[in-house]
């Protein structure tokens, strides 16, 4: 099944930045965010909404790796941590939402200095809507490859294929989704920019309200998407949502970057 406003078609183009990070060019479009009532093991915070993404954006082909993190930040936050395999191609973990945001800011500065990024562009975390739109890649099924969870092992690392390997694996080893994105299902949870709310936001370019306007009880929670190497298939579904304090760091938390034009003043007030 395909989403309204987009088709699976050919895999989108990609670009490579100055640190060797490949980004997939995601087209603008419309889609239904969340899961249908009949989806197996869906939960109430996935109630469907109609979303329009009015602008194209770039999204990391893989999760940010340890090697990429070290190039930009010069640190190893995962060093000495539990359940981590040190490898430049493994995802950077033990990073909070704040850490990931700082990485995006520093990468923006590096790219501008290298002449690879225009003054009106930036790197940032994807919004929750952008993340799910890119994960689905034109599909409406539980996963980007269909509804059969038995196929999940071909596309991601989850609790069913990491029992003897208790760590996140090298990025890009599993099959990509229809738009060429790897590890959207499993491996590590991925931070999104949004504050967490119990209901999804629809409309055009939705972003959960910023600090000071979010109603309790979630004033510090940010959205996590994608599942990780130690969860059941239900946690790796395209619509699955999770949340945690923005300062939390753990062995199963990572992120991928988005690249887009800077938000306008009107957009920042959303």
Predicted regions and their residues:
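Bacterial N-terminal signal peptides
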Residues: 1-4
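Boundary at the C-terminal end of the N-terminal hydrophobic targeting segment
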Residues: 7-12
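Conserved beta-strand positions that form and line the central face of beta-propeller blades
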Residues: 14, 25, 50, 82, ...
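Mature N-terminal segment immediately following signal peptide/propeptide cleavage
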Residues: 16-33
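Short loop/turn microsegments at loop-to-beta-strand junctions
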Residues: 22, 121-122, 176-179
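Active-site microenvironments of metalloenzymes and redox enzymes
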Residues: 30-41, 51-154, 193-204, 259-270
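Surface-exposed recognition segments
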Residues: 41-52, 139-145, 162-167, 184-270
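A short, contiguous structural element within a folded domain that forms the immediate neighborhood
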Residues: 152-181, 214-215
């Amino acid at each position: 099944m395909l989403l309204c406003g987009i088709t699976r078609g050919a895999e989108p183009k990609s670009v490579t930045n100055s640190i060797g990070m490949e980004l997939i060019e995601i087209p603008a479009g419309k889609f239904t965010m969340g899961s249908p009532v009949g989806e197996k093991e869906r939960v109430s915070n996935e109630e469907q909404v109609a979303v329009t993404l009015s602008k194209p954006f770039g999204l990391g082909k893989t999760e940010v790796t340890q090697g990429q993190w070290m190039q930009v930040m010069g640190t190893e936050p995962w060093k000495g941590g539990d359940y981590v395999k040190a490898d430049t191609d493994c995802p950077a973990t033990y990073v909070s939402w704040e850490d990931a945001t700082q990485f995006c800011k520093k990468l923006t500065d590096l790219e501008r200095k290298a002449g690879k990024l225009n003054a009106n562009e930036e790197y940032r975390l994807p919004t929750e809507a952008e993340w799910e739109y890119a994960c689905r890649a034109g599909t409406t099924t539980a996963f980007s490859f269909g509804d059969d969870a038995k196929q999940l092992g071909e596309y991601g690392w989850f609790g069913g294929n990491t029992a003897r390997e208790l760590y996140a694996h090298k990025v890009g080893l599993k099959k990509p989704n229809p738009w060429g994105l790897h590890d959207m299902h499993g491996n590590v949870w991925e931070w999104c920019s949004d504050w967490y709310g119990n209901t999804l936001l629809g409309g055009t370019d939705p972003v959960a309200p910023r600090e000071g306007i979010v109603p309790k009880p979630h004033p510090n929670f940010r959205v996590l998407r994608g599942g990780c190497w130690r969860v059941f298939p239900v946690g790796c579904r395209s619509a699955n949502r999770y949340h945690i304090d923005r300062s939390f760091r753990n062995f199963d938390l990572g992120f991928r970057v988005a690249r887009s034009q800077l938000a306008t003043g009107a957009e920042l007030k959303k």
